[in-house]
Amino acid sequence: MGKRKANHTISGMNAASAQGQGAGYNEEFANENLTAAERQNNKKRKKNQ
């Protein structure tokens, strides 16, 4: 069969598709630095704190 790309991702949104990014959550801001308040409430990093 071979590997298939996941159907639930939005094409062009993220190169690493279907890798737990939350399907388009916050990818457009991935390169910007977060403020202190955003860093406290960052959904991607909350499990690592």
Swiss-Prot record:
The keyword GTP-binding belongs to this UniProt entry's keyword annotation: no
Keywords: Sporulation
GO BP, sorted A to Z: asexual sporulation; sporulation resulting in formation of a cellular spore
Pfam families: SspO (PF08175)
Induction per the UniProt record: Expressed only in the forespore compartment of sporulating cells.
Biased composition (Polar residues): 8-20
Location of region: Disordered: 1-49
Keyword Protease attributed: no
InterPro entries attached to this UniProt entry: SASP_SspO
Designated name of the protein: Small, acid-soluble spore protein O
Organism: Bacillus cereus (strain AH187)
Source lineage: Bacteria, Bacillati, Bacillota, Bacilli, Bacillales
